[in-house]
From Swiss-Prot:
GO terms for molecular function: aminomethyltransferase activity; transaminase activity. This is Aminomethyltransferase. It comes from Legionella pneumophila subsp. pneumophila (strain Philadelphia 1 / ATCC 33152 / DSM 7513). Belongs to the GcvT family. The gene is gcvT. InterPro entries: GCS_T (IPR006223), GCS_T_bac (IPR022903), GCST_C (IPR013977), GCV_T_N (IPR006222), GcvT/YgfZ/DmdA (IPR028896), GcvT/YgfZ_C (IPR029043), TrmE/GcvT_dom1 (IPR027266).
Amino acid sequence: MTAKTPLHTTHLACGAKMVDFHGWDMPLHYGSQLNEHHAVRNDAGMFDVSHMTIVDILGAGGRQFLRKLLTNDVDQITHNGKALYSCMCNEHGGIIDDLIVYQRASDNYRVVLNSATRQNDVAWIRAKSEGFAVGLQERRELSMLAVQGPNAIAKTLSILAPAHVDAVSTLTSFECVDVDHWFFARTGYTGEDGLEIIVPNEFVTQLWNDLLHAGVTPCGLGARDTLRLEAGMLLYGQDMDETTTPLESGLAWTVKWEPEDRGFIGMGALVSQKQQGIKRKMVGLTLLDKGIMRHGQKVIIEGCPDGIITSGSYSPTLQQSIALARVPMETGEQVLVDIRGKLIPAKVGKPRFIKQGKPV
């Protein structure tokens, strides 16, 4: 039986087409995935992301623990209310998950993880926390909305209480704030500005309806996927997993090597991979002829082993097919993609296609 978020009946009332997403009954779209995509790029859209896993790490040992657990270094967080994106790796350097960690206080960190990896992630974090002065709380009583787009913050501010408005108005990118049991973060998964809002379950329906009345468009998983693909944001389980490392996933920037004595989990394996030479990289592909690139298709590179499409789709913004692919380091400026037995040329570029609504 699939799990349901507190907004399930609200989604049905809004005309959502529901699908099973890793055991959750979630909206795919509300009639037009294309319109929802454009709403986020040009105005404001909202997503129910209450299926995500929220874990609070409490106690004086929180920072010390996270410096061991994550590839990125929370010592870069210089004050409360800051956020950091990171990978969480196993001892072999394989990516267990990617996540955002928020410092709410010196002894209070919030981690938001992917839903598909909930059970494994929580078990891993709990096991690795032994010996540290921390306690873990999985916050299933909370719901989460992502409000994204160039007008997302303005429309959200128009429906918030004055105390919330004052706090949210001062947030900059990758900052967060708690106000009256509501949590606001200026983060997202679309390549647009916006907020991710975490509230007690009993408040989320009213928040959704207020945003709807303010002109924010309900959006489903379909638009979320094309938006994040255009922005070059990876999807765990598809673009990377425990068989891949940050260094071959375009995520080397999330690995902080200094100080060497930090010794985060997987550091030894990643240092070894770096020294021996990274053999694969993540690139962006733009198809040069008709067709749609999809996950799992082969990428043919002259003189090299085949690469693989990890994510591919039609880009509503660029009006052509785009993809993320893992290919040999020697890959040049053009490749061939095997689409149903036909070899279609594609241009190789950086794994990001759109920034703030504009082509990169």
